[in-house]
Amino acid sequence: MIPVVALVGRPNVGKSTLFNRLTRTRDALVADFPGLTRDRKYGRAFLSGYEFIVVDTGGIDGTEEGIETKMAEQSLAAIEEADVVLFMTDARAGLTAADLSIAQHLRSREKTTFVVANKVDGIDADSACAEFWSLGLGEVYQMAASQGRGVTNMIEYALTPYAEAMGIVRQGEDEVTEEREYTEEEAEAEQKRLQDLPIKLAIIGKPNVGKSTLTNRILGEERVVVFDEPGTTRDSIYIPMEREGREYVIIDTAGVRRRSKVHQVIEKFSVIKTLKAVEDANVVLLIIDAREGIAEQDLGLLGFALNAGRALVIAVNKWDGIDQGIKDRVKSELDRRLGFIDFARIHFISALHGTGVGHLFESIEEAYDSATRRVSTSMLTRIMQMSQDDHQPPLVNGRRVKLKYAHAGGYNPPIVVIHGNQVSRLPDSYKRYMMNYFRRSLKVVGTPIQLRFQEGDNPFENKTEKLTMSQERRRKRAQSHIKDRKTK
Protein backbone atom coordinates (compact mmCIF):
# COMPACT_ATOMS: atom_id res chain seq x y z
CA MET A 1 0.00 0.00 0.00
CA ILE A 2 1.41 3.37 -0.98
CA PRO A 3 1.90 5.58 2.12
CA VAL A 4 0.40 9.05 2.47
CA VAL A 5 2.45 11.96 3.85
CA ALA A 6 0.53 15.06 4.95
CA LEU A 7 2.28 18.44 5.18
CA VAL A 8 0.72 20.41 8.04
CA GLY A 9 1.47 23.89 9.33
CA ARG A 10 0.35 27.48 9.42
CA PRO A 11 0.64 29.60 6.25
CA ASN A 12 4.06 30.61 4.87
CA VAL A 13 6.15 28.00 6.65
CA GLY A 14 7.24 26.36 3.36
CA LYS A 15 4.65 23.62 2.81
CA SER A 16 4.23 24.45 -0.87
CA THR A 17 7.99 24.70 -1.37
CA LEU A 18 8.49 21.23 0.08
CA PHE A 19 5.50 19.90 -1.86
CA ASN A 20 6.92 21.19 -5.15
CA ARG A 21 10.34 19.75 -4.37
CA LEU A 22 8.93 16.33 -3.50
CA THR A 23 6.61 16.11 -6.52
CA ARG A 24 8.75 17.78 -9.18
CA THR A 25 9.56 14.52 -10.97
CA ARG A 26 5.88 13.73 -11.40
CA ASP A 27 4.51 17.19 -12.04
CA ALA A 28 4.95 17.18 -15.82
CA LEU A 29 3.25 13.84 -16.45
CA VAL A 30 0.08 15.44 -17.77
CA ALA A 31 1.88 18.11 -19.80
CA ASP A 32 0.79 16.39 -23.01
CA PHE A 33 -2.86 17.06 -22.20
CA PRO A 34 -3.38 20.81 -22.60
CA GLY A 35 -6.46 22.24 -20.96
CA LEU A 36 -6.33 19.89 -17.99
CA THR A 37 -6.79 21.41 -14.54
CA ARG A 38 -4.40 19.95 -11.99
CA ASP A 39 -4.98 19.90 -8.25
CA ARG A 40 -1.75 21.20 -6.74
CA LYS A 41 -2.60 19.95 -3.26
CA TYR A 42 -2.08 16.27 -4.03
CA GLY A 43 0.88 14.67 -5.75
CA ARG A 44 2.89 11.50 -6.22
CA ALA A 45 6.52 11.47 -5.21
CA PHE A 46 9.51 9.15 -5.18
CA LEU A 47 12.42 9.87 -2.87
CA SER A 48 14.96 7.87 -0.92
CA GLY A 49 13.61 4.58 -2.25
CA TYR A 50 9.98 5.22 -1.30
CA GLU A 51 7.01 6.03 -3.50
CA PHE A 52 4.30 7.95 -1.67
CA ILE A 53 1.40 10.38 -1.95
CA VAL A 54 2.09 13.84 -0.54
CA VAL A 55 -0.70 16.17 0.56
CA ASP A 56 -0.32 19.91 1.13
CA THR A 57 -2.96 20.65 3.78
CA GLY A 58 -3.14 24.35 3.06
CA GLY A 59 -5.73 26.43 4.87
CA ILE A 60 -5.01 25.41 8.45
CA ASP A 61 -4.41 28.74 10.14
CA GLY A 62 -4.06 27.46 13.67
CA THR A 63 -6.72 29.72 15.20
CA GLU A 64 -9.12 28.26 17.72
CA GLU A 65 -12.03 28.95 15.39
CA GLY A 66 -10.20 27.27 12.55
CA ILE A 67 -9.39 24.17 14.57
CA GLU A 68 -12.80 23.76 16.14
CA THR A 69 -15.11 24.75 13.29
CA LYS A 70 -15.14 24.01 9.57
CA MET A 71 -11.50 24.86 9.11
CA ALA A 72 -10.51 23.24 5.83
CA GLU A 73 -12.55 20.06 6.06
CA GLN A 74 -10.60 18.35 3.30
CA SER A 75 -7.33 19.26 5.02
CA LEU A 76 -8.50 17.76 8.30
CA ALA A 77 -9.69 14.66 6.46
CA ALA A 78 -6.25 14.38 4.85
CA ILE A 79 -4.63 14.47 8.30
CA GLU A 80 -6.95 11.71 9.50
CA GLU A 81 -6.17 9.54 6.49
CA ALA A 82 -2.41 10.17 6.39
CA ASP A 83 0.09 7.57 7.52
CA VAL A 84 2.71 10.17 8.44
CA VAL A 85 2.30 13.87 9.30
CA LEU A 86 5.11 16.38 8.79
CA PHE A 87 4.33 19.33 11.08
CA MET A 88 6.21 22.22 9.49
CA THR A 89 7.29 25.32 11.43
CA ASP A 90 9.33 28.42 10.60
CA ALA A 91 12.68 28.44 12.40
CA ARG A 92 13.22 32.11 11.56
CA ALA A 93 9.86 33.26 12.96
CA GLY A 94 10.09 31.04 16.01
CA LEU A 95 7.30 29.35 17.93
CA THR A 96 3.88 31.02 17.55
CA ALA A 97 0.45 30.61 19.10
CA ALA A 98 -0.76 29.08 15.84
CA ASP A 99 1.96 26.42 16.07
CA LEU A 100 0.86 25.57 19.62
CA SER A 101 -2.78 25.28 18.55
CA ILE A 102 -1.98 22.99 15.61
CA ALA A 103 0.29 20.86 17.82
CA GLN A 104 -2.52 20.43 20.33
CA HIS A 105 -4.83 19.20 17.56
CA LEU A 106 -2.21 16.74 16.28
CA ARG A 107 -1.57 15.37 19.77
CA SER A 108 -5.29 14.73 20.19
CA ARG A 109 -5.35 12.69 16.97
CA GLU A 110 -2.42 10.48 18.03
CA LYS A 111 -0.94 10.55 14.53
CA THR A 112 2.66 9.63 13.71
CA THR A 113 4.02 13.18 13.60
CA PHE A 114 7.45 14.64 12.89
CA VAL A 115 8.20 18.27 13.74
CA VAL A 116 10.13 19.99 10.94
CA ALA A 117 11.85 23.34 11.56
CA ASN A 118 12.12 24.84 8.09
CA LYS A 119 14.18 27.82 6.82
CA VAL A 120 17.28 27.02 8.88
CA ASP A 121 19.64 28.30 6.19
CA GLY A 122 21.82 31.23 7.25
CA ILE A 123 20.95 31.12 10.97
CA ASP A 124 22.12 29.32 14.10
CA ALA A 125 19.84 26.36 13.52
CA ASP A 126 20.33 24.59 16.86
CA SER A 127 19.46 27.69 18.87
CA ALA A 128 16.51 28.59 16.65
CA CYS A 129 15.03 25.10 16.83
CA ALA A 130 15.38 24.55 20.56
CA GLU A 131 12.01 26.08 21.48
CA PHE A 132 10.08 23.73 19.18
CA TRP A 133 10.85 20.83 21.52
CA SER A 134 8.21 22.31 23.85
CA LEU A 135 5.49 21.23 21.39
CA GLY A 136 5.67 17.77 22.94
CA LEU A 137 5.80 15.91 19.63
CA GLY A 138 9.30 14.50 19.90
CA GLU A 139 12.48 15.29 18.01
CA VAL A 140 12.75 18.44 15.88
CA TYR A 141 14.19 17.93 12.38
CA GLN A 142 16.01 20.78 10.64
CA MET A 143 15.35 21.55 6.98
CA ALA A 144 15.87 24.18 4.29
CA ALA A 145 13.23 23.11 1.77
CA SER A 146 14.03 25.84 -0.75
CA GLN A 147 17.59 24.51 -1.06
CA GLY A 148 16.74 20.84 -0.56
CA ARG A 149 18.82 20.54 2.61
CA GLY A 150 17.57 17.84 4.95
CA VAL A 151 14.67 16.80 2.71
CA THR A 152 15.95 13.32 1.85
CA ASN A 153 16.94 12.55 5.45
CA MET A 154 13.54 13.72 6.65
CA ILE A 155 11.69 11.35 4.32
CA GLU A 156 13.94 8.49 5.42
CA TYR A 157 13.22 9.22 9.09
CA ALA A 158 9.51 9.52 8.44
CA LEU A 159 8.84 6.57 6.13
CA THR A 160 11.34 3.87 7.12
CA PRO A 161 9.53 2.81 10.35
CA TYR A 162 6.17 2.77 8.55
CA ALA A 163 7.59 0.82 5.60
CA GLU A 164 9.15 -1.79 7.91
CA ALA A 165 5.91 -2.19 9.85
CA MET A 166 3.86 -2.60 6.65
CA GLY A 167 6.40 -4.80 4.88
CA ILE A 168 6.99 -2.28 2.08
CA VAL A 169 10.17 -3.07 0.15
CA ARG A 170 12.42 -0.09 -0.37
CA GLN A 171 13.27 0.43 -4.03
CA GLY A 172 16.33 1.77 -5.76
CA GLU A 173 16.13 4.74 -8.11
CA ASP A 174 16.86 2.50 -11.08
CA GLU A 175 13.95 0.21 -10.22
CA VAL A 176 11.50 3.07 -10.73
CA THR A 177 13.12 4.96 -13.57
CA GLU A 178 14.48 2.01 -15.55
CA GLU A 179 12.56 1.30 -18.73
CA ARG A 180 12.23 -2.42 -19.24
CA GLU A 181 13.05 -3.76 -22.69
CA TYR A 182 11.01 -6.90 -23.33
CA THR A 183 12.09 -9.69 -25.61
CA GLU A 184 9.36 -11.08 -27.87
CA GLU A 185 8.91 -14.07 -25.52
CA GLU A 186 8.82 -11.91 -22.38
CA ALA A 187 6.34 -9.52 -23.93
CA GLU A 188 4.03 -12.39 -24.86
CA ALA A 189 4.26 -13.86 -21.34
CA GLU A 190 3.60 -10.48 -19.69
CA GLN A 191 0.63 -9.80 -21.94
CA LYS A 192 -0.84 -13.24 -21.18
CA ARG A 193 -0.36 -12.69 -17.44
CA LEU A 194 -2.27 -9.42 -17.58
CA GLN A 195 -5.05 -10.90 -19.71
CA ASP A 196 -5.56 -13.73 -17.19
CA LEU A 197 -5.94 -11.37 -14.21
CA PRO A 198 -9.28 -9.85 -13.15
CA ILE A 199 -9.87 -6.32 -14.43
CA LYS A 200 -9.58 -3.85 -11.54
CA LEU A 201 -12.17 -1.13 -12.11
CA ALA A 202 -12.09 2.05 -10.00
CA ILE A 203 -15.36 4.00 -9.93
CA ILE A 204 -14.56 7.63 -9.15
CA GLY A 205 -16.37 10.95 -9.16
CA LYS A 206 -17.07 13.97 -7.04
CA PRO A 207 -19.65 13.72 -4.22
CA ASN A 208 -23.21 12.71 -5.03
CA VAL A 209 -22.77 11.94 -8.73
CA GLY A 210 -24.12 8.42 -8.25
CA LYS A 211 -21.07 6.25 -7.51
CA SER A 212 -22.87 4.17 -4.88
CA THR A 213 -26.03 3.91 -6.98
CA LEU A 214 -24.04 2.67 -9.97
CA THR A 215 -22.03 0.20 -7.88
CA ASN A 216 -25.17 -1.26 -6.35
CA ARG A 217 -26.81 -1.40 -9.78
CA ILE A 218 -23.84 -3.38 -11.13
CA LEU A 219 -23.72 -5.72 -8.16
CA GLY A 220 -27.48 -6.21 -8.14
CA GLU A 221 -27.49 -7.21 -11.78
CA GLU A 222 -24.44 -9.43 -11.65
CA ARG A 223 -24.94 -11.16 -8.26
CA VAL A 224 -21.83 -10.27 -6.30
CA VAL A 225 -19.63 -13.23 -5.39
CA VAL A 226 -18.43 -11.78 -2.09
CA PHE A 227 -20.52 -8.93 -0.75
CA ASP A 228 -18.90 -5.87 0.70
CA GLU A 229 -17.02 -6.10 3.98
CA PRO A 230 -16.95 -3.03 6.21
CA GLY A 231 -13.93 -0.94 5.26
CA THR A 232 -12.09 1.72 7.19
CA THR A 233 -12.65 5.38 6.44
CA ARG A 234 -9.46 5.53 4.40
CA ASP A 235 -9.58 2.29 2.43
CA SER A 236 -11.74 1.62 -0.60
CA ILE A 237 -13.82 -1.54 -0.76
CA TYR A 238 -12.66 -4.26 -3.17
CA ILE A 239 -15.54 -6.35 -4.51
CA PRO A 240 -14.88 -9.33 -6.79
CA MET A 241 -17.53 -10.14 -9.36
CA GLU A 242 -17.95 -11.98 -12.65
CA ARG A 243 -19.75 -10.88 -15.78
CA GLU A 244 -20.19 -12.99 -18.91
CA GLY A 245 -17.26 -15.21 -17.99
CA ARG A 246 -14.84 -12.36 -17.25
CA GLU A 247 -13.65 -11.59 -13.74
CA TYR A 248 -13.61 -8.08 -12.29
CA VAL A 249 -12.67 -6.39 -9.05
CA ILE A 250 -14.77 -3.29 -8.40
CA ILE A 251 -12.88 -0.68 -6.36
CA ASP A 252 -15.58 1.39 -4.71
CA THR A 253 -14.38 4.70 -3.31
CA ALA A 254 -17.79 5.74 -1.98
CA GLY A 255 -18.51 2.62 0.05
CA VAL A 256 -21.24 0.23 -1.02
CA ARG A 257 -24.50 0.88 0.84
CA ARG A 258 -26.55 -2.05 1.99
CA ARG A 259 -29.93 -2.08 0.32
CA SER A 260 -31.66 -0.48 3.28
CA LYS A 261 -29.38 2.53 2.93
CA VAL A 262 -29.31 3.01 -0.82
CA HIS A 263 -31.54 6.07 -0.47
CA GLN A 264 -28.82 8.01 1.34
CA VAL A 265 -27.61 10.92 -0.77
CA ILE A 266 -24.77 12.22 1.40
CA GLU A 267 -21.40 10.56 1.00
CA LYS A 268 -17.99 11.38 2.35
CA PHE A 269 -15.60 12.36 -0.40
CA SER A 270 -11.92 11.55 0.01
CA VAL A 271 -9.33 12.62 -2.52
CA ILE A 272 -6.75 10.32 -0.95
CA LYS A 273 -9.07 7.33 -1.20
CA THR A 274 -9.62 8.18 -4.86
CA LEU A 275 -5.88 8.51 -5.51
CA LYS A 276 -5.20 5.11 -3.98
CA ALA A 277 -7.99 3.52 -6.00
CA VAL A 278 -6.70 5.01 -9.26
CA GLU A 279 -3.15 3.83 -8.52
CA ASP A 280 -4.37 0.27 -7.99
CA ALA A 281 -6.83 0.09 -10.90
CA ASN A 282 -6.43 -1.05 -14.49
CA VAL A 283 -9.43 0.92 -15.75
CA VAL A 284 -10.96 4.08 -14.27
CA LEU A 285 -14.67 4.84 -14.67
CA LEU A 286 -15.19 8.58 -14.13
CA ILE A 287 -18.78 9.59 -13.40
CA ILE A 288 -19.96 13.10 -14.29
CA ASP A 289 -23.30 14.59 -13.22
CA ALA A 290 -25.24 15.58 -16.36
CA ARG A 291 -27.24 18.19 -14.46
CA GLU A 292 -24.17 20.00 -13.15
CA GLY A 293 -21.94 19.71 -16.21
CA ILE A 294 -18.16 19.45 -16.03
CA ALA A 295 -16.83 20.90 -12.78
CA GLU A 296 -13.23 21.73 -11.88
CA GLN A 297 -13.28 18.78 -9.50
CA ASP A 298 -14.12 16.48 -12.42
CA LEU A 299 -11.06 17.75 -14.29
CA GLY A 300 -8.93 17.25 -11.19
CA LEU A 301 -10.06 13.63 -10.89
CA LEU A 302 -9.43 13.18 -14.60
CA GLY A 303 -5.91 14.46 -13.98
CA PHE A 304 -5.34 11.74 -11.36
CA ALA A 305 -6.28 9.05 -13.88
CA LEU A 306 -4.11 10.51 -16.66
CA ASN A 307 -1.20 10.98 -14.25
CA ALA A 308 -1.33 7.29 -13.45
CA GLY A 309 -1.68 6.37 -17.14
CA ARG A 310 -4.84 4.37 -16.55
CA ALA A 311 -7.36 3.26 -19.15
CA LEU A 312 -10.41 5.49 -18.98
CA VAL A 313 -14.18 5.34 -19.55
CA ILE A 314 -16.46 8.31 -18.86
CA ALA A 315 -20.09 7.94 -17.76
CA VAL A 316 -22.43 10.94 -17.78
CA ASN A 317 -25.00 10.00 -15.14
CA LYS A 318 -28.56 11.22 -14.43
CA TRP A 319 -29.22 11.48 -18.18
CA ASP A 320 -32.88 10.58 -17.78
CA GLY A 321 -35.44 13.24 -17.00
CA ILE A 322 -33.58 16.24 -18.44
CA ASP A 323 -34.84 18.06 -21.51
CA GLN A 324 -33.18 17.98 -24.91
CA GLY A 325 -31.80 21.50 -24.61
CA ILE A 326 -29.75 20.57 -21.53
CA LYS A 327 -28.57 17.38 -23.24
CA ASP A 328 -27.33 19.35 -26.25
CA ARG A 329 -25.54 21.82 -23.96
CA VAL A 330 -23.83 19.00 -22.03
CA LYS A 331 -22.67 17.28 -25.23
CA SER A 332 -21.29 20.58 -26.53
CA GLU A 333 -19.42 21.13 -23.26
CA LEU A 334 -17.97 17.62 -23.39
CA ASP A 335 -16.66 18.22 -26.91
CA ARG A 336 -15.18 21.57 -25.92
CA ARG A 337 -13.59 20.74 -22.57
CA LEU A 338 -12.69 17.07 -23.00
CA GLY A 339 -11.43 17.17 -26.56
CA PHE A 340 -7.91 16.34 -25.38
CA ILE A 341 -9.01 12.84 -24.29
CA ASP A 342 -10.71 11.87 -27.53
CA PHE A 343 -9.42 8.32 -27.02
CA ALA A 344 -11.94 7.71 -24.17
CA ARG A 345 -15.45 6.38 -24.72
CA ILE A 346 -18.28 8.50 -23.27
CA HIS A 347 -21.57 6.91 -22.18
CA PHE A 348 -24.83 8.56 -21.16
CA ILE A 349 -26.47 6.52 -18.42
CA SER A 350 -28.97 6.44 -15.59
CA ALA A 351 -27.51 4.50 -12.67
CA LEU A 352 -30.84 4.71 -10.84
CA HIS A 353 -32.88 3.07 -13.61
CA GLY A 354 -30.08 1.05 -15.22
CA THR A 355 -30.27 2.75 -18.62
CA GLY A 356 -27.01 2.26 -20.54
CA VAL A 357 -25.18 0.57 -17.64
CA GLY A 358 -24.66 -2.73 -19.47
CA HIS A 359 -22.88 -1.02 -22.37
CA LEU A 360 -20.26 0.38 -19.97
CA PHE A 361 -18.62 -3.04 -19.75
CA GLU A 362 -18.10 -3.20 -23.50
CA SER A 363 -15.98 -0.04 -23.31
CA ILE A 364 -14.25 -1.18 -20.10
CA GLU A 365 -13.14 -4.43 -21.73
CA GLU A 366 -12.16 -2.60 -24.93
CA ALA A 367 -10.04 -0.12 -22.94
CA TYR A 368 -8.35 -2.87 -20.92
CA ASP A 369 -7.61 -4.95 -24.01
CA SER A 370 -6.07 -1.89 -25.71
CA ALA A 371 -3.98 -1.13 -22.63
CA THR A 372 -2.59 -4.68 -22.44
CA ARG A 373 -2.31 -5.57 -26.13
CA ARG A 374 1.10 -6.86 -27.20
CA VAL A 375 2.63 -5.32 -30.31
CA SER A 376 5.86 -6.65 -31.79
CA THR A 377 9.02 -4.60 -32.19
CA SER A 378 8.86 -5.00 -35.97
CA MET A 379 5.31 -3.61 -36.07
CA LEU A 380 6.15 -0.62 -33.84
CA THR A 381 9.26 0.13 -35.89
CA ARG A 382 7.26 -0.06 -39.12
CA ILE A 383 4.65 2.39 -37.76
CA MET A 384 7.46 4.71 -36.65
CA GLN A 385 8.97 4.63 -40.15
CA MET A 386 5.57 5.33 -41.72
CA SER A 387 5.10 8.35 -39.47
CA GLN A 388 8.49 9.68 -40.65
CA ASP A 389 7.60 9.08 -44.28
CA ASP A 390 4.37 11.05 -43.88
CA HIS A 391 5.94 13.87 -41.88
CA GLN A 392 9.72 14.09 -41.49
CA PRO A 393 11.23 15.06 -38.12
CA PRO A 394 12.54 18.64 -38.01
CA LEU A 395 16.13 19.79 -38.49
CA VAL A 396 18.21 20.49 -35.38
CA ASN A 397 21.37 22.55 -35.93
CA GLY A 398 21.17 21.74 -39.62
CA ARG A 399 20.88 17.99 -39.06
CA ARG A 400 17.74 15.89 -39.41
CA VAL A 401 16.59 14.08 -36.26
CA LYS A 402 16.91 10.38 -37.04
CA LEU A 403 14.58 7.78 -35.52
CA LYS A 404 16.04 4.26 -35.68
CA TYR A 405 13.65 1.73 -34.12
CA ALA A 406 10.83 1.36 -31.58
CA HIS A 407 9.83 -1.33 -29.10
CA ALA A 408 7.29 -1.93 -26.34
CA GLY A 409 8.32 -0.55 -22.96
CA GLY A 410 5.35 -1.59 -20.85
CA TYR A 411 1.62 -2.11 -20.57
CA ASN A 412 -1.32 -0.38 -18.86
CA PRO A 413 -0.55 2.20 -20.18
CA PRO A 414 1.05 1.06 -23.44
CA ILE A 415 4.57 2.49 -23.57
CA VAL A 416 6.48 2.82 -26.84
CA VAL A 417 10.22 3.44 -26.54
CA ILE A 418 11.76 5.13 -29.59
CA HIS A 419 15.52 5.14 -30.14
CA GLY A 420 17.37 7.58 -32.35
CA ASN A 421 19.76 10.50 -32.67
CA GLN A 422 18.95 13.92 -31.17
CA VAL A 423 15.52 12.67 -30.09
CA SER A 424 15.74 14.72 -26.88
CA ARG A 425 15.48 17.82 -29.10
CA LEU A 426 12.24 16.81 -30.79
CA PRO A 427 9.61 19.53 -30.28
CA ASP A 428 6.46 18.67 -28.33
CA SER A 429 4.35 19.21 -31.44
CA TYR A 430 6.15 16.38 -33.26
CA LYS A 431 5.90 14.11 -30.22
CA ARG A 432 2.14 14.68 -30.12
CA TYR A 433 1.97 13.96 -33.85
CA MET A 434 3.75 10.64 -33.31
CA MET A 435 1.55 9.76 -30.33
CA ASN A 436 -1.59 10.30 -32.38
CA TYR A 437 -0.07 8.39 -35.31
CA PHE A 438 0.64 5.35 -33.12
CA ARG A 439 -2.86 5.53 -31.60
CA ARG A 440 -4.55 5.60 -35.02
CA SER A 441 -2.32 2.92 -36.50
CA LEU A 442 -2.76 0.54 -33.54
CA LYS A 443 -6.47 1.42 -33.20
CA VAL A 444 -6.00 2.02 -29.48
CA VAL A 445 -9.23 2.99 -27.70
CA GLY A 446 -9.78 3.97 -24.09
CA THR A 447 -6.19 4.32 -22.95
CA PRO A 448 -3.45 6.94 -23.28
CA ILE A 449 -0.20 6.01 -25.01
CA GLN A 450 3.14 7.06 -23.58
CA LEU A 451 6.13 7.68 -25.84
CA ARG A 452 9.64 7.61 -24.41
CA PHE A 453 12.65 8.70 -26.41
CA GLN A 454 16.17 7.35 -25.91
CA GLU A 455 19.38 8.47 -27.54
CA GLY A 456 22.10 5.97 -28.30
CA ASP A 457 25.50 6.82 -26.86
CA ASN A 458 28.26 7.49 -29.37
CA PRO A 459 30.89 4.77 -28.67
CA PHE A 460 33.66 7.02 -30.05
CA GLU A 461 32.77 10.05 -27.95
CA ASN A 462 35.62 11.22 -25.68
CA LYS A 463 37.93 8.51 -27.06
CA THR A 464 41.16 9.13 -28.96
CA GLU A 465 41.94 7.05 -32.01
CA LYS A 466 44.45 4.26 -31.31
CA LEU A 467 47.42 4.37 -33.74
CA THR A 468 48.95 1.33 -35.39
CA MET A 469 52.63 0.50 -34.72
CA SER A 470 53.76 1.93 -38.06
CA GLN A 471 51.73 5.11 -37.47
CA GLU A 472 53.28 5.44 -34.02
CA ARG A 473 56.83 5.13 -35.47
CA ARG A 474 56.09 7.78 -38.11
CA ARG A 475 54.68 10.09 -35.42
CA LYS A 476 57.83 9.73 -33.31
CA ARG A 477 60.11 10.37 -36.32
CA ALA A 478 58.13 13.50 -37.17
CA GLN A 479 58.36 14.73 -33.57
CA SER A 480 62.12 14.16 -33.45
CA HIS A 481 62.56 15.91 -36.80
CA ILE A 482 60.66 18.97 -35.52
CA LYS A 483 62.74 18.93 -32.33
CA ASP A 484 66.02 18.81 -34.31
CA ARG A 485 64.96 21.80 -36.42
CA LYS A 486 64.19 23.83 -33.30
CA THR A 487 67.64 23.18 -31.79
CA LYS A 488 69.51 24.34 -34.90
UniProtKB/Swiss-Prot annotation:
Positions annotated to bind GTP 2: 205-212, 252-256, 317-320
Presence of the UniProt keyword Metal-binding in the record: no
Keywords: GTP-binding, Nucleotide-binding, Repeat, Ribosome biogenesis
Annotated segments matching region Disordered: 460-488
UniProt xrefs under SUPFAM superfamilies: P-loop containing nucleoside triphosphate hydrolases (SSF52540)
Cross-referenced CDD domains: EngA1, EngA2
Binding-site residues, GTP 1: 9-16, 56-60, 118-121
UniProt entry tagged with the keyword Nucleotide-binding: yes
GO biological process entries: ribosome biogenesis
Span of domain EngA-type G: 3-166, 199-372
UniProt xrefs under InterPro entries: G_ENGA, GTP-bd, GTPase_Der, KH_dom-like, KH_dom-like_a/b, P-loop_NTPase, Small_GTP-bd
Oligomer and partners: Associates with the 50S ribosomal subunit.
Function: GTPase that plays an essential role in the late steps of ribosome biogenesis.
Entry's family note: Belongs to the TRAFAC class TrmE-Era-EngA-EngB-Septin-like GTPase superfamily. EngA (Der) GTPase family.
Protein name: GTPase Der
The organism's taxonomic lineage, starting at the top: Bacteria, Pseudomonadati, Pseudomonadota, Gammaproteobacteria, Alteromonadales
Name of encoding gene: der
